[in-house]
Amino acid sequence: MNLAASEHQDDQLLNAAITRANIKESFESYLEIVDAFYSDDVEVILGEDTEPVRGRDDLRAHLANFLVPIHVMAELGGLSVSIRFTAIPATDGADTHSRWEATFRVSSGVTRAFGWSVQRRWKDSRVNYERHYDHQVGGPPISFEIFD
């Protein structure tokens, strides 16, 4: 198997792990995914005009800060979260690309969707660079007030 095919297979495994994780049950499962798939010296750019997150430990901390409120709203407030991805064929063969959508739905039926694209570079079967771009948002904001 050539290097590009191996990276593509690793990317498929990572994407499948992300979509299988259940935020209502645990946010820690996402941190375990970081441990399993990301290099110690990973660099992640979460959007334009944002400082890169450098290192697996910082990525774990950043991810936990983001996921804990979502986990609480899902576990206690009835927030439903679904995550989907579509692989994007790479033109250069060096990176992997995918398009993601996370849909948040509260019990009243209010829904908000977030979309973004991801570019990854792999080294030794670990992500060592990831960039999120082309962010899109649809639907009204969801906050704790909407659960009343």
Q: What are these regions, as identified by a protein language model?
A:
Residues 31-96:
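A solvent-exposed, acidic/Ser-Thr-rich amphipathic alpha-helical stretch
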Residues 40, 107, 123:
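Short, ordered coil/turn segments that flank beta-strands lining enzyme active or ligand-binding pockets
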Residues 97-103:
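Short Pro/Gly-enriched beta-strand edge/turn motifs at strand-loop
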Residues 113-146:
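Short beta-strand edge/turn micro-motifs at domain boundaries
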